[in-house]
Amino acid sequence: MKLATPRWWYLREGAPSPITRALLTPLSWIWAAQTARRIARTTPRGADCAVICVGNFTVGGVGKTPIVRELLLTLTKRGRRAHGLARGYGGKLKGPVRVEPSRHTVAEVGDEPLMLAQDFPMWVSRDRVLGARKAAASGAEVVVMDDGHQNPDLRKTLSLVVVDGETREDEWPFGDGRVFPAGPMREPLNVSLGRTDAVIVLLPADLPEADPRLLALFGDTPVLIARLEPAAPPPKGRQVGFAGIGKPWKVERALKAAGCHLVDFAPYPDHGQYDEATLNFLWERAQTYSAGLVTTEKDWVRLPQAWRDRVTPWPVRARFEDEGALGALLESVGL
């Protein structure tokens, strides 16, 4: 059974009680030590192409997939043969396999690769090195890897880390800074930052600017600001929303900020599958309010085919505020 991301992970005060902190802290020490040991003992292997890693410091969703999409689009516009690469979380295929939307399903390749494959060459591979090499053999000049900052197997040309820029209502992207499971961090921030070429702070569309206190944490590491913006207006009329992403409450907030008449919202675990019972519950809920159903593109591709006409997917896109700075960063590694 998939578990939802604890909201307290992303609150400044962290765990809701001292007892919870005390119970989880020893497990955090073990997790951090294992991560450090794996990275220290692994010699990265290369592929016959450049590799841009889009990772994160934390467990849970920060908006990597929209950034991966925007980077693939930017590289393609710059004349580069760019392919995407993902582990295929939630899919059963080990790969390496090129994702074909007309043939593959979410159960085989995962939701994010299937979504990205609608627009770009996309590969799924549990072994990132084999996946990157397969992409290179198929003509890729550069591979954009979704996640993998803590995976030392594949040598990176550029390591980018996406940070959720939401800091309102006592939210903080790193919580109280504790490592999983006592907090959201995959490893201590200073350790992870040491392997980072640039940080991408992803802001909600309605947040005026990045929090200076957050930016100060990154020291001399270059920071790019991007915004997660609607690619289309939300559906008109009353709507019941639902989402199964790392931080589903952000979808609810974004829909309301975009002007959606949201009468109810249901959060679900990240990458979870929607069975008939769940979908019937949502449909009946919408009928109670005389409302439609709206969800994210990522959730929509996980719906059974028979349900897709009943649910409106709401697309969002990442936009870099300073495209020149992004271009300079890519040029610095020959891209």
UniProtKB/Swiss-Prot annotation:
Binding site residues for ATP: 58-65
Molecular function in Gene Ontology: ATP binding; tetraacyldisaccharide 4'-kinase activity
Pfam families associated with the record: LpxK (PF02606)
GO biological process: lipid A biosynthetic process; lipopolysaccharide core region biosynthetic process
Record keywords, A-Z: ATP-binding, Kinase, Lipid A biosynthesis, Lipid biosynthesis, Lipid metabolism, Nucleotide-binding, Transferase
This protein's GO CC annotations: plasma membrane
Annotated EC: 2.7.1.130
Recorded metabolic or biological pathway in which this protein acts: Glycolipid biosynthesis; lipid IV(A) biosynthesis; lipid IV(A) from (3R)-3-hydroxytetradecanoyl-[acyl-carrier-protein] and UDP-N-acetyl-alpha-D-glucosamine: step 6/6
Keyword Transferase: yes
InterPro entries: LpxK, P-loop_NTPase
EC primary class: transferase
Reactions catalysed: a lipid A disaccharide + ATP = a lipid IVA + ADP + H(+)
Entries under SUPFAM superfamilies matching the protein: P-loop containing nucleoside triphosphate hydrolases
Annotated function: Transfers the gamma-phosphate of ATP to the 4'-position of a tetraacyldisaccharide 1-phosphate intermediate (termed DS-1-P) to form tetraacyldisaccharide 1,4'-bis-phosphate (lipid IVA).
Family assignment from sequence similarity: Belongs to the LpxK family.
Record PANTHER family: TETRAACYLDISACCHARIDE 4'-KINASE, TETRAACYLDISACCHARIDE 4'-KINASE, MITOCHONDRIAL-RELATED
Record protein name field: Tetraacyldisaccharide 4'-kinase
Organism expressing this protein natively: Caulobacter sp. (strain K31)
Record gene name: lpxK
